[in-house]
């Protein structure tokens, strides 16, 4: 029996951010009571063996408080964060909106988090008994100007490095002013070069190489996207996560929340993100690629794999469909390529 259809109306009666935080609190306290799901076909990627191809996207468990619960629910990997060097409260509330008619969410959270040190303490407490791999998503603080953004990423990376199975470089959130400017041209080149250089030093110190992946936005013009892909390829960065939320709210025009600031996720992002995955795979056939965006069903999950993704993450789909979506995705066959 799937209880989530009965629980969802109760959760949706609450303010979205309150419901989100309450759910995380319950999961963090009740993890030991969740039956462990052992499902999926392992895949070797990024120097690791992932238990399966399905992961939790960053943003749901920003402070890594419910890793054990998500691990027991069956995820093959869990991406926590976004974590910044210093704690920050994020953007003013309200900043999270549900659009059930569209199976969508708009968020303008603004990297609210307890800081990378606190997150790493949470990861360290559970990592040895966690089956899923753990990715740590890092970003810059709101008050750090773009000219010094690399310093923030370097601080976060060096702090998180011992605890991460991979690190995700978030330069694509629409909710930190100017952040997406780091996706282009000289700014992207410099950032990736500095991160790669520091990663090589950390690899020697810790005697392990933690893969670096860049998380990109879905709103780039094709020429911009191709420029980004060329820079990423030349940089030696290990992979791409595509995509973050979109600023294009055409699909929800007329909804009472359509004009809210922030990024749109969920079903309206499904087709756009899948097309970007296919384009990236065509351009970079061998680069590890994680799909994120608009996975609302097992068919969406499989479509991302068919488009060329190696791994797939969910977030909004979990809000609308609950843990049953995890089971449905893990029942899907591996793609034939």
UniProtKB/Swiss-Prot annotation:
Presence of the UniProt keyword Membrane in the record: yes
Oligomeric and partner information: Monomer.
Protein name, as recorded: Dihydroorotate dehydrogenase (quinone)
Recorded metabolic or biological pathway in which this protein acts: Pyrimidine metabolism; UMP biosynthesis via de novo pathway; orotate from (S)-dihydroorotate (quinone route): step 1/1
Active site positions: 173 (nucleophile)
Cofactor binding note of this UniProt entry: Binds 1 FMN per subunit.
Compartments where located: Cell membrane
Pfam families named among the record's database cross-references: DHO_dh
InterPro entries tied to this protein: Aldolase_TIM, DHO_dehydrogenase, Dihydroorotate_DH_1_2, Dihydroorotate_DH_2, Dihydroorotate_DH_cat, Dihydroorotate_DH_CS
Sequence positions that bind substrate: 62, 107-111, 170, 175, 244-245
PROSITE patterns given in the database record: DHODEHASE_1
Species annotation: Dichelobacter nodosus (strain VCS1703A)
A GO cellular component annotation in the UniProt record: cytoplasm
Needed co-factor(s): FMN
Amino acids binding FMN: 58-62, 82, 137, 170, 215, 243, 266, 294, 315-316
Lineage: Bacteria, Pseudomonadati, Pseudomonadota, Gammaproteobacteria, Cardiobacteriales
Job description of the protein: Catalyzes the conversion of dihydroorotate to orotate with quinone as electron acceptor.
Keyword Transmembrane helix: no
């Amino acid at each position: 029996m799937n209880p989530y259809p009965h629980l969802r109306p109760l959760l949706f009666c609450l303010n979205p951010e309150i419901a989100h935080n309450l759910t995380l609190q319950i999961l963090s306290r009740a993890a030991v009571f969740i039956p462990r799901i052992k499902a999926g076909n392992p895949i070797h990627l990024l120097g690791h063996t992932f238990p399966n191809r399905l992961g939790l996207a960053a943003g749901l468990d920003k402070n890594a408080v419910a890793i054990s619960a998500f691990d027991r629910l069956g995820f093959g990997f869990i991406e926590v964060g976004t974590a910044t060097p210093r704690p920050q409260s994020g953007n003013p509330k309200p900043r999270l909106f549900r659009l059930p008619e569209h199976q969508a969410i708009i968020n303008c959270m603004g990297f609210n988090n307890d800081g990378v040190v606190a997150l790493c303490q949470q990861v360290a407490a559970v990592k040895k008994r966690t089956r899923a791999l753990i990715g740590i998503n890092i970003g810059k603080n709101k008050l750090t100007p773009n000219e010094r953004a690399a310093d923030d990423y370097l601080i976060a990376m060096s702090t998180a490095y011992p605890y991460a199975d991979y690190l995700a470089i978030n330069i694509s959130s629409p909710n930190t002013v100017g952040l997406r400017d780091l996706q282009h041209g000289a700014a992207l080149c410099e950032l990736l070069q500095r991160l790669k250089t520091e990663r090589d030093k950390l690899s020697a110190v810790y005697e392990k190489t933690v893969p670096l992946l860049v998380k990109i936005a879905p709103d780039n013009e094709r020429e911009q996207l191709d420029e980004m892909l060329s820079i990423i390829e030349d940089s030696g960065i290990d992979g791409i996560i595509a995509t973050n939320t979109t600023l294009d709210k055409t699909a929800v025009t007329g909804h009472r929340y359509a004009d809210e600031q922030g990024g749109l996720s969920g079903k309206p992002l499904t087709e756009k993100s899948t097309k970007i995955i296919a384009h990236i795979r065509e351009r970079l056939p061998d680069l590890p690629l994680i799909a994120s965006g608009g996975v609302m069903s097992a068919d969406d999950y499989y479509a991302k794999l068919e488009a060329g993704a190696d791994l797939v993450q969910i977030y909004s789909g979990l809000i609308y469909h609950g843990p049953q979506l995890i089971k449905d995705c893990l029942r899907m066959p591996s793609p034939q390529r």
